Amino acid sequence: MGKKDKTEIKVEEENKEKKQYKKKKEREELEIPKGIDPWKPLELKRDDVGKRVLYDDSSFATLFPKYREKYLQEIWKLVENVLHEHGIECKLDLIEGSMTVTTTKKCWDPVAILKARDLIKLLSRSVPFEHAQKVLNDDYNCDIIKIGGFVRNKERFVKRRQRLVGPDGSTLKAIELLTKCYVLVQGNTVSSIGPWNGLVQVRKIVEDCLKNIHPIYNIKELMIKRELEKDETLKNENWERYLPQFKKTNQNKKKKVQKKKKDRDAAPFAPPQLPRKEDLAMESGEYFASEEKKRRKIQADREAKHAESDQKRKDERQKSQIAPAEKDRSTTTTTNTSNIQDTLSNIKNNLKNNKRKEAPTNNADDFVLKKNKK
């Protein structure tokens, strides 16, 4: 019996190996035709599902700001019509400022309630209805990125958020074209709608932008990747050698820690320990005195301090009452007379030096023309 069991086991192992070989061969023979995505989810239709799928109601609710109230009132009928196709009810509460989405017995897609939740979230974040309704399709998903906690300084935050949008929205348009996603920057959030691959790229660009990495670097990288995807020879190769590697130009300005020079004259050992209050009291004998003596001494010291402070206050008051010292008039008169004498002597010297020169005597004959002698 034992021998038969061994032979049977060997036969089973051989059959397994043959089956595995056949499977590998079949896989190699199978070829996916071009233009078909094998990872694309299959569409779920109403005919593929039974009459009733959900046996319990589930609901989601979100709040919306006051400035969205008017727009939501205008498009709410469209929202109801779109969600009614999936068997979902929606309510708009203007008093509380909330939107609620609930499943019904007619709901045949269990994922539809999650898609409806994303729809009302996007509508509350100022996304227009034309773009928000795309979330209900299987090919589209949404991602709401919170950017409020990346930067503390408000001015710096506004500057980096504007950098993400770019001049006339050019940077945002480039991101949308490369990632195949719709992107909207609103307040402290960035909403994006598109395929999963594009949403991951959008999140990376947004987070890097708020970490002070310009979006142009990521945009360049995406452009190079898109060109490399077209080349069939480079599809299965590593692309790191083709991608640009940007280095930081702004270095962190850290203060250099200066090493302290050792003083040669400094003592090699630590200074002696200072005495405590108890030690000083023991030396003076106060430590062994009775409590009454200690109290009397404290009182005497306190009175002496009060007396000293009172004396200082009296001296300051008396200073204001003391008349200021008069100036000596004799010194002022002597200085004035000496100044007057100096000025007079200077004037006399100037007159002597600048005497008028005597004018030359002029005769009448000097002004008459003399006849020329023949």
Curated annotation (Swiss-Prot):
UniProt cross-references to Gene3D superfamilies, sorted A to Z: K Homology domain, type 1
CDD domains (alphabetical): KH-I_KRR1_rpt1, KH-I_KRR1_rpt2
Pfam families: KH_KRR1_1st, KH_KRR1_2nd
GO MF entries: RNA binding
Regions annotated as coiled coil: 1-34
GO annotations of cellular component type: nucleolus; small-subunit processome
Keyword tags: Coiled coil, Nucleus, Ribonucleoprotein, Ribosome biogenesis, RNA-binding, rRNA processing
GO biological process assignments: ribosomal small subunit biogenesis; rRNA processing
Primary residence: nucleus
Function: Part of the small subunit (SSU) processome, first precursor of the small eukaryotic ribosomal subunit. During the assembly of the SSU processome in the nucleolus, many ribosome biogenesis factors, an RNA chaperone and ribosomal proteins associate with the nascent pre-rRNA and work in concert to generate RNA folding, modifications, rearrangements and cleavage as well as targeted degradation of pre-ribosomal RNA by the RNA exosome.
Family affiliation: Belongs to the KRR1 family.
Subunit and partners: Part of the small subunit (SSU) processome, composed of more than 70 proteins and the RNA chaperone small nucleolar RNA (snoRNA) U3.
Classification via PANTHER family: HIV-1 REV BINDING PROTEIN 2, 3, KRR1 SMALL SUBUNIT PROCESSOME COMPONENT HOMOLOG
Record-given protein name: KRR1 small subunit processome component homolog
Source organism (scientific name): Dictyostelium discoideum
